[in-house]
Amino acid sequence: MLILISPAKTLDYQSPLTTTRYTLPELLDNSQQLIHEARKLTPPQISSLMRISDKLAGINAARFHDWQPDFTPENARQAILAFKGDVYTGLQAETFSEDDFDFAQQHLRMLSGLYGVLRPLDLMQPYRLEMGIRLENARGKDLYQFWGDIITNKLNEALAAQGDNVVINLASDEYFKSVKPKKLNAEIIKPVFLDEKNGKFKIISFYAKKARGLMSRFIIENRLTKPEQLTGFNSEGYFFDEASSSNGELVFKRYEQR
């Protein structure tokens, strides 16, 4: 099974590292091409393109400028320990054992606007470049055109390496759109997380993102290899609802705390 998750805007390059092991991203030649395009942007252009404040635009212009292709533990950090958004709050990779990191390295992939596909221990220099951003480049008008089949091909390599054909899609729609399902050599399973609000179950973004991290952790900690094992997920009050689920979609619900 190959788990797909989105990256995070919030980054952490300060906390103590829980592993010193690392690998290097496999698509850095592509990343360098995007950095070349991003360096052409002024901070005001970055602010407009990314819809972020002038202060954040300045920070990210500096990140693009400082980015260099030689990744070391001194200028980069393992991706799974660098991302710090809601998904990663649920994942809690900072508490992983070395065996957990081993399993995650084989079975978890982070989709990325700049790096394409990241393995958990791949070193990553700080950046902000969301997949949905319309950054014109030599291959087209946006990042979806830039990456084309590259991300899908890399995922197929990972699936072949583990002798498996199941993808657990825990990524957001914005990021999964960079994958070509018809060219992916896999059955795609999408867990959906619904929280009760005023008597009705619906997707609440913050909770759903955290739940994607919780599910990823559940798979990694328990070394799950078959999609039917996911139905045992019960972290933080979620339960599997078979009646609402279908072949490709596993629905998990949680009652409102009263």
Swiss-Prot record:
Q: Which InterPro entries match?
A: YaaA
Spell out the Pfam families in the cross-references: H2O2_YaaD
Any Gene Ontology biological process: response to hydroperoxide
GO CC list: cytosol
The record's similarity note reads:
Belongs to the UPF0246 family.
Looking up PANTHER family in the UniProt record yields: PEROXIDE STRESS RESISTANCE PROTEIN YAAA, PEROXIDE STRESS RESPONSE PROTEIN YAAA
Recorded hits in HAMAP family, A to Z, give: UPF0246 (MF_00652)
Q: What is this protein called?
A: UPF0246 protein YaaA
What organism does the UniProt record list as the source?
A: Escherichia coli O6:H1 (strain CFT073 / ATCC 700928 / UPEC)
This chain is encoded by the gene named: yaaA
